Amino acid sequence: MEKIVPPAVRIEELRRILREHEYRYYVLSSPTIDDFEYDAMMKQLEELEREYPEWDSPDSPTHRVGSDKTEGFASVRHDRPMLSLSNTYNYDEIGDFYRRVSEGLQGAPFEIVAELKFDGLSISLIYEDGMLVRAVTRGDGIMGDDVTANVRTIRSVPLRLRGDDYPRMLEVRGEILLPFKEFDRINAQREAEGEPLFANPRNAASGTIKQLDPHIVAGRNLDAYFYYLYSDEPLAENHYDRLMQARQWGFKVSDAVTLCCSKEEVYAFIDRFDTERLTLPVATDGIVLKVNAPAQQDLLGFTAKSPRWAIAYKYQAERVRTRLQHVSYQVGRTGAVTPVANLDPVLISGTVVRRASLHNADFIAEKDLHEGDFVYVEKGGEIIPKIVGVDTDARSIDGRPIVFTVLCPDCATPLVREQGEAAYYCPNAEGCPQQQKGRLEHYCGRKTADINIGPETIELLYSRNMIRNVADFYALTEEQLLTLPGFKKRAAAKLLDSIEASKARPYQAILFGLGIRFVGETVAKKLAAVYPSIDALAAATSEELVQIDEIGERIAAAVLHFFSLRQNRELIERLRLAGVSLEAETVSVAVSNRLAGKTVVISGTFEKRSRDEYKAMVEDNGGRMAGSVSSKTSFILAGSDMGPSKREKAEKLGVRLMSEEEFLRLIEE
């Protein structure tokens, strides 16, 4: 008779065995079982812990660096939005910030904390009873990805807080970074292995934290700095002391934090780090200024996008001189061909730059670029390298002028340039591999079909001739996927489930995903609101389309051209047969007709509702939104920081400016 093992004993036995195999695999590099056996035991342990939660333990292998290499990331709503900061670039704008804060506090004195602005990936950590329970990326500020398993691998992130005076529930926000030294090591390794290089440490940190395998994350030695605490329970009385409190609890807080009682002290801090930041081990892109007292922060509040009690000062971009080797070209999903400058490697803002943007053919002609030229390179906002000048005095007599390519670099089709367009395009939309793969990646994005698949898998499927257009995703089978290297049943099932779920995505998301030229997320939403099915949109005329707000002749022509092509009509029919949503589930019905016949422009920032909420309220009450002020504008819903050009035009045309309080009273009457 088979001996029955109690669940608690089996759980501990599995943990012991898994820990031993983790040690042999990751420390000794001498595994004694294959991945299938390891995954089977891990799955059994996960199932037992779910069935017997009383035997769960924070040090279980299921709570640490996981073995599940195919698991995606769950979306999590932030308890408090992770807003961005308003930027300022000179001392006059800092003076304006001081004035706004003083007015908001009715002249009361205030202190400012000056801190380094780290250039990485924003993260929110949640601790319960001193234990790390969740780590969520900033995402769109409202929703982020749960990357707890990956964050646990970062040694500067405490898994358990030090001391015993921390609150029961604590949120800590900070920045995940890849040190310059690690960035150079990883790029050297990728170059040796023939893999594409990371553009900068920020992209590398973001790409690393989104890895599906936490072991890869652990091998990249990410770092983290922290700068904000929140709890419903008492914390230190001011922001500066809370940072010191965080340091005591085991968080890495920068030494570059100063309490300032005057603008002059702020300016001194900024001047000091204008040079010192270049010697730091991690990337920074400015200074953050925060009102020190939380009570005063609460009084100042927030706009729809950012806190009124904080601002970011951005340093001027660093400029260096290097040699232009040659120009290469990239093809985007719409066929636009973009030139790229290949440079002698040069260090800018702590990263090695080898390539820079050249924008288009006009830019090359305007700069009169020659091969071998010495050029001046900056990083716009400390991130995107760009050429800003040419040292013509140092030009070699042998340097040949750079002439924009006449052929597609991917499929050798002659390029075309439409009248009024800056870019050259490859017209071979159906036969150009880079365009095809670009459209496939675009369709799978979170704001489109939201299919959980990465560029590497798309490249693999494309190379095996399994996909050529977006309808091919819906014809994939488990048998096909299991022939791919690295794909097992679970990975295949997850991808197929994600593809199946995409069929229920909103019509406007699918419309955006089709990749119609000039039809971005906002335009797709506007088109879907007027034409609630793909068939209705396909039947629209140019005259009808240009009547829609913000849709001009160029977008209308692109829409008509898309539906005029036989291959696109066949694509839509295949999507329809696959069950993809190609019409809106419900047609929006006005809540009231209070704004019937009214054309409304929204400008500025608001306290009570977001701009999107106000737009919805206008449309729900029969009104029409417009993006610019004209004689047809009925009124402007004007928030703070309203654009000066719109205000000037409104005054000139006699258009009424309505406050949000007046607008809400109008709607609620």
From Swiss-Prot:
PROSITE patterns: BRCT, DNA_LIGASE_N1, DNA_LIGASE_N2. It is an enzyme of class 6 (ligase). GO terms for biological process: DNA repair; DNA replication. Keywords: DNA damage, DNA repair, DNA replication, Ligase, Magnesium, Manganese, Metal-binding, NAD, Zinc. Disulfide bonds: none annotated. NAD(+) binds at residues 35-39, 84-85, 115, 138, 175, 290, 314. Residues 52-71 are annotated as: Disordered. GO terms for molecular function: DNA binding; DNA ligase (NAD+) activity; metal ion binding. Its EC number is 6.5.1.2. The keyword Metal-binding applies. Residues 61-71 have a biased composition (Basic and acidic residues). It catalyses: NAD(+) + (deoxyribonucleotide)n-3'-hydroxyl + 5'-phospho-(deoxyribonucleotide)m = (deoxyribonucleotide)n+m + AMP + beta-nicotinamide D-nucleotide. The keyword NADP does not apply. Residues 590-669 form the BRCT domain. Zn(2+) binds at residues 408, 411, 426, 432. GO terms for cellular component: cytosol. Pfam families: BRCT, DNA_ligase_aden, DNA_ligase_OB, DNA_ligase_ZBD, HHH_2, HHH_5, Nlig-Ia. Its cofactor is Mg(2+); Mn(2+). DNA ligase that catalyzes the formation of phosphodiester linkages between 5'-phosphoryl and 3'-hydroxyl groups in double-stranded DNA using NAD as a coenzyme and as the energy source for the reaction. It is essential for DNA replication and repair of damaged DNA. HAMAP family: DNA_ligase_A (MF_01588). Belongs to the NAD-dependent DNA ligase family. LigA subfamily. This is DNA ligase.
